[in-house]
Regions:
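An N-terminal hydrophobic leader/cap segment in hydrolases
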Residues: 1-83, 93, 346-349, 367-377
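Short beta-strand element of the alpha/beta-hydrolase
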Residues: 102-110
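Catalytic nucleophile-loop/oxyanion-hole region of alpha/beta-hydrolase
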Residues: 140-174
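Short glycine-enriched nucleophile-adjacent loop
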Residues: 184-197, 206
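The serine-hydrolase catalytic nucleophile loop
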Residues: 110-124, 290
């Protein structure tokens, strides 16, 4: 993300406290993308390679050290554009694994991310035969710029529009959703606000990584991490309440509407009957793993097919880098629980380098002794 784009995002954040919060999300991936340099490949001078694909391939090889996640050429990548219900034009991509496939993954990036991060996160599903749709949320990448950034409230309209676009143009039989951080929040938000819509559009499962369940808990986590001092609960609640009030004045939106916990615990909302695999790391600096656990527990009252994976050591949205073997294994086995195609899953795992020897050796974990993983049998 360029400095000009970064300043534009911060100007729209509203209250000054939100500017500080938003800035903390920007720092890491901006630095990572700027650190990658390129040289021309003389052997492939006649092959056009999208510069973003080239950059992301470098990141996957040099930083993630996962060549399995790279793309060779992008002949089967097509740009798309679609419009949201409030008139925002969204920029996206379709990756066509198989023109005859009716299985699709929609992958949703984190705050300050972009569609190419979403595409690379979805790479394991290509080995299962899924086509992929990715897009830039409003105020990100090549999508329209708007007056406000809301960390999920208005951005949820973008995912709704993506699902509608996919249904209208591709007639999928199965849609899976994959979300990271803000993208994960939005998926969870839609499960408690758009239940019939998700059922109608054949959304069958979702994966949620590093989600937050409310702006209140997100603020609490960020400020405890940044300010480095102890707040008692009373002080914590007052500070967050004051921030939200000033944010509502700045944006003219009710930010308490974004509290998913209230929908479960106070309003007794029943979520869409879509199983979710929840993933988080206990040492995440930006969102709390307790949010993910709390979402899982709230959903367990009505949904028995969810799974929960909590790493002791995994940074914000880094499970694919730090725990590649176990994360991809859990993703694909979770999908197979819903879709039931053992042969395809086995071949995909082998192609991605996840063989029995690695699985039996605790996924070759170097950071974990015992990872918390739960599913109901």
């Amino acid at each position: 993300m360029k400095s000009k784009e970064r300043r534009k995002i911060l100007r729209k954040a509203g209250d000054k406290n939100f500017k500080a919060l938003d800035k903390s999300f920007i720092e890491f991936y901006t630095l990572l993308e700027k650190s990658v340099f390129f040289r021309k490949n003389k052997k492939r001078k006649y092959i056009y390679m999208n510069p973003e694909i080239s950059k992301m391939n470098k990141i996957m090889k040099l930083y993630f050290k996962k060549p399995q996640l790279t793309f060779e050429i992008d002949d089967n990548i097509a740009p798309i554009r679609f419009e949201t219900e409030d008139g925002v034009v969204i920029s996206g991509l379709k990756y066509i694994t198989d023109p005859n496939s009716k299985k699709w993954i929609i992958s949703c990036h984190w705050f300050t991310g972009h569609k190419y991060w979403s595409l690379y996160w979805a790479k394991p599903f290509i080995e299962l035969g899924y086509n992929i749709l990715v897009f830039d949320f409003r105020n990100h990448g090549e999508s329209d710029s708007t007056d406000l950034i809301t960390l999920g409230l208005l951005e949820s309209k973008d995912l709704v529009a993506a699902i509608k676009y996919l249904t209208d143009n591709e007639k999928p039989q199965t849609i899976g959703l994959l979300g990271m951080s803000m993208g994960a929040y939005i998926i969870n938000y839609l499960t408690v606000t758009q239940q019939e819509f998700l059922k109608k559009h054949k959304v069958k499962f979702a994966i949620s990584e590093s989600a937050y369940g409310s702006i209140e808990t997100l603020l609490s986590k960020i400020y405890r991490s940044r300010i480095k001092r102890f707040f008692n609960k009373k002080m914590d609640n007052k500070i967050i309440s004051d921030i939200l009030k000033s944010q509502e004045k700045a944006t003219l939106y009710d930010w308490t509407e974004m509290n998913i916990f209230d929908k479960y615990e106070k309003e007794n909302v029943k979520p869409a009957q879509i199983p979710i695999l929840f993933i988080h790391g206990n040492n995440d600096r930006y969102t709390s793993s307790s949010d993910t656990t709390r979402l899982f527990i709230n959903r367990s009252r009505t949904i028995k097919n969810d799974e929960l994976l909590i790493y002791n050591f995994s940074g914000h949205c880094t499970s694919l880098k730090e725990h590649y073997n176990q994360t991809v294994y859990r993703w694909l086995k979770f999908e197979n629980k819903i879709i039931n195609d053992d042969d395809v899953t086995k071949k995909a795992l082998e192609k991605l380098g996840i063989v029995d020897k690695i699985i039996e050796n605790n996924f070759n974990e170097s950071l974990e002794i015992s990872t918390f993983y739960f599913k109901e049998e």
